[in-house]
Amino acid sequence: MARAFPLERVRNIGIAAHIDAGKTTCTERILFYSGVVHKMGEVHDGAAVTDWMAQERERGITITAAAISTTWNDHRINIIDTPGHVDFTIEVERSMRVLDGVIAVFCAVGGVQPQSETVWRQADRYSVPRMVFVNKMDRTGADFLKVHGQIKNRLKANAIPIQLPIGAEGDLSGIIDLVKNKAFIYKDDLGKEIEETEIPDHMKEIAAEWRSKLMECVAETDEELIEVFLETEELSEAQLASGIREGVLNHGLVPLLCGSAFKNKGVQLLLDAVVDYLPAPVDVPPIQGLLPNGKEAVRPSDDNAPFSALAFKVMSDPYGKLTFVRMYSGVLEKGSYVLNSTKNEKERISRLIILKADDREEVDALRAGDLGAVLGLKNTTTGDTLCTTDDPIVLETLYIPEPVISVAVEPKTKGDMEKLSKALLSLAEEDPTFRVSTDPETSQTVIAGMGELHLEILVDRMLREFKVEANIGAPQVSYRETIRASSKGEGKFARQTGGKGQYGHVVIEMEPGEPGSGFEFVNKIVGGIVPKEYIKPAESGMRETCESGVIAGYPLIDVKVTMVDGSYHDVDSSEMAFKIAGSMAFKDGVKKCNPVLLEPMMKVEVEIPEDFLGAIIGDLSSRRGQVEGQSIDDGLSKVQSKVPLAEMFGYATQLRSMTQGRGIFSMEFSHYEEVPRNVAEAIISKNQGNS
């Protein structure tokens, strides 16, 4: 079967933003105008096509990244609608990894919010070209140019308007296209009747001013254009359009568009801009990966190149397990066998699907540049590479943040234990930031995730999808341990119990590692004073002790261990003896290296009416918070702070009562920081008391 759209006419885009900026509504309107749906769905009515989980429709928020295909101006557009709530950061992260371009949606009233910064950083991490849609221009207090200023200042982006709104708030009647130098006036409520006309007299001056700024900005991204601009102080429409496209592809320019998705204004022009300015798979650098020999290689976006794809999401489905894939090169055919090169296991491709939210279209093949789903993969999880068995490669994988909160969970009835295990396993397969473990002390099942809402939604899904009712314990913070000094550690395990004894002896040097290094082991044993076959068991004993902690039972991070000495016995030494000796040496070293407890610090932004500012700052300080900045805008105060996660449980309820329901806050993980001594002592003694 031939390709339906040439690669140059394919766009893989994401729609990402802060919660409530209106991105799901934008997606709905795109589907309406491009003919995928024939009736508009509203988020607040629970009828949005891309919000397909029951909880999404109830809560009016998008939790999972829904992938949808549509067409516009003879181009195939694959869209991923991502969640804006910080607890679902992994959904944004995994969609950024597989996209070629992003529409960042900002609210014309709220502007740049904390989660917008997170999404922007994620797009930066994967170097995704982007443009901005300033939505909700119909709302009271909408200010397009104020949002432009915030994007330049807070996100440090070279943002430039390519449109201007005609009117604002209730009087939004049309949009000026600065590239075409024309006005588009909306004649009906559905936004289907649009009249292209001259720019209204009262806006000619401001349009000329911003068009001149646009030309200057575009000219600066290209040497040929700057020469033309310096000579004539003018660029043609074609020069402007190609200059904007070049600027977007090279990350030198972020075009700003405006409109109101809810009022059906600006969406068709946004689709035109997606086609005109965002990259096709062939416009972005080819995907990099590692060959079996460890050398780097690339896979070009080409149907004739060896097949390679990245699994970026796994979902349970009534028909089986759905694995979403981004095709990078080659062709994937139904019925074929492929290699999961991450796990070195073969997989059979039973069915291939292109998604249109709740609707699905079965296809015989997926081609380079496609976003689709495979039904029936047995061993593939998020971040795995699928490729041809003849030409294996492992592609760059996803960045997966560590969970920061955990709770104990148990079924309400003992008979549901097996159902609970199945449900947790299935949910953990779908979501790599959701971890399931068993507490070795209490034998309780512990689930960990990115925040209270994240775990709440997952428990809710257990009830709805797996019919398991569960009791949830109080939230627990994921502390970490580390060391602040260097020292030696020694472990000698000698046991004689008649017959063959046990003997292992390990000496190590321990020092703080680089931030983010985890556990690093170096072997400096020379001259065979400890035989090679005992080094690995000794390291294994240290690694296991590192994972279970020394002072309070939390994983130890950023520690470097060098094995420098030891001794063995010809008869009595064994792998197990050296594993125990390694663990003993590690514990001995940690105790001499000034061990400390670390806690997750959260970046908290609170938005409240000005009258409550004093009370809120006082409350944050009482939670061991450090206020880092504040601003007042239109009677609303924004307070930025860093607060320990341990002090933030139940904050939503407290904030509501302190501000009579008028305060809102957002919270995301920032970094780990040392726990004050008095707090650490209480945590350590509590944990030692439990053990």
From Swiss-Prot:
GO cellular component: cytoplasm
Domain tr-type G: 8-282
Gene Ontology biological-process entries: ribosome disassembly
SMART domains xrefs: EFG_C, EFG_IV
Keywords: Cytoplasm, Elongation factor, GTP-binding, Nucleotide-binding, Protein biosynthesis
Gene Ontology MF terms: GTP binding; GTPase activity; translation elongation factor activity
Pfam families tied to this protein: EFG_C, EFG_III, EFG_IV, GTP_EFTU, GTP_EFTU_D2
CDD domains registered for this protein in UniProt: EF-G, EFG_III, EFG_mtEFG1_IV, EFG_mtEFG_C, EFG_mtEFG_II
Tagged with keyword Protein biosynthesis: yes
Protein's UniProt keywords contain Nucleotide-binding: yes
InterPro entries, per the entry: EFG_II, EFG_III, EFG_III/V, EFG_IV, EFG_V, EFG_V-like, EFTu-like_2, G_TR_CS
PANTHER family per the UniProt record, alphabetical: RIBOSOME-RELEASING FACTOR 2, MITOCHONDRIAL, TRANSLATION ELONGATION FACTOR G-RELATED
Family: Belongs to the TRAFAC class translation factor GTPase superfamily. Classic translation factor GTPase family. EF-G/EF-2 subfamily.
Entry function: Catalyzes the GTP-dependent ribosomal translocation step during translation elongation. During this step, the ribosome changes from the pre-translocational (PRE) to the post-translocational (POST) state as the newly formed A-site-bound peptidyl-tRNA and P-site-bound deacylated tRNA move to the P and E sites, respectively. Catalyzes the coordinated movement of the two tRNA molecules, the mRNA and conformational changes in the ribosome.
Protein name as catalogued: Elongation factor G
Protein source organism: Prochlorococcus marinus (strain MIT 9313)
Upper classification of the organism: Bacteria, Bacillati, Cyanobacteriota, Cyanophyceae, Synechococcales
